[in-house]
């Protein structure tokens, strides 16, 4: 990771970079790895906790358990990370109500600066999706989804977090800078297999195969019309607390 960041600094002017985020699973964040990441220049961690309920984690086939998730956050804080976000999942069949409330309370008790809460999506061609197709569990209905989303919103905003985007909550001053760029139509460069980029007019996405990517396979490209860009502006900005600026649509 240090080599990648150093090479990026050789190719691009990164002097204005205000935040360098790394996403990781809890079971990967050993004290040694956390220290190495700090030395490499990582100053923000996004930790894929998903839940602090072991039964819920088992249902979702996660490698880690709740104890590992807690330890990952505490180890990161001990290493000096002062900008940590945890990803949580709601809408998991059988794990709303008290289970979700305990997960939210546990996350708040860790004094992290940012929390992302996403509704579970069951993809058909996954192990989880195949289990649902066999009738092992059923997706939650719309009423349950709404109730759980309301619980997430009320709990986190009640604790002082800003609900600044559909799925994202931050303490003042800790909004995710890279995500905000996507929602506001900024340009970005994606490097690696399956990575997406946007140059202001065209979207590019790399092949997903590592072998094909290393062999130099060309990225696919979509050129956006003015109508496409307007529609994307509306859709992405409606995800944010700021909403749409009418002057910007003219």
Where are these regions (language model features)?
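C-terminal scaffold of the Radical SAM
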Residues: 1-250
């Amino acid at each position: 990771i240090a080599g990648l960041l150093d090479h990026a600094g050789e190719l691009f002017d990164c002097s204005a970079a205000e935040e360098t985020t790394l996403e990781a699973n809890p079971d990967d964040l050993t004290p040694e790895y956390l220290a190495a990441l700090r030395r490499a220049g990582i100053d923000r961690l996004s930790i894929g906790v998903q839940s602090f309920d072991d039964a819920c984690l088992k249902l979702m086939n996660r490698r880690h358990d709740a104890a590992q998730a807690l330890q990952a956050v505490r180890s990161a804080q001990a290493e000096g990370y002062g900008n940590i976000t945890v990803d949580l999942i709601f809408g998991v069949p059988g794990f709303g109500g008290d289970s979700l409330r305990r997960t939210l309370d546990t996350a708040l008790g860790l004094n992290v600066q940012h929390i992302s809460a996403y509704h579970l999506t069951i993809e058909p061609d996954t192990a989880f999706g195949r289990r649902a197709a066999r009738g092992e569990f059923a997706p939650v209905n719309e009423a349950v989804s709404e109730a759980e989303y309301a619980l997430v919103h009320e709990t986190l905003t009640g604790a002082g977090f800003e609900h600044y985007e559909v799925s994202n909550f931050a303490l003042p001053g800790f909004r995710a800078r890279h995500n905000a760029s996507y929602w506001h139509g900024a340009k970005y460069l994606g490097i690696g297999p399956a990575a997406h980029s946007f140059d202001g007019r065209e979207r590019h996405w790399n092949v997903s195969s590592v072998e094909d990517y290393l062999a130099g396979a060309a990225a696919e490209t979509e050129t956006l019309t003015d109508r496409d860009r307007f529609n994307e502006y509306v859709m992405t900005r409606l995800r944010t607390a700021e909403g749409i600026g009418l002057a910007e649509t003219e």
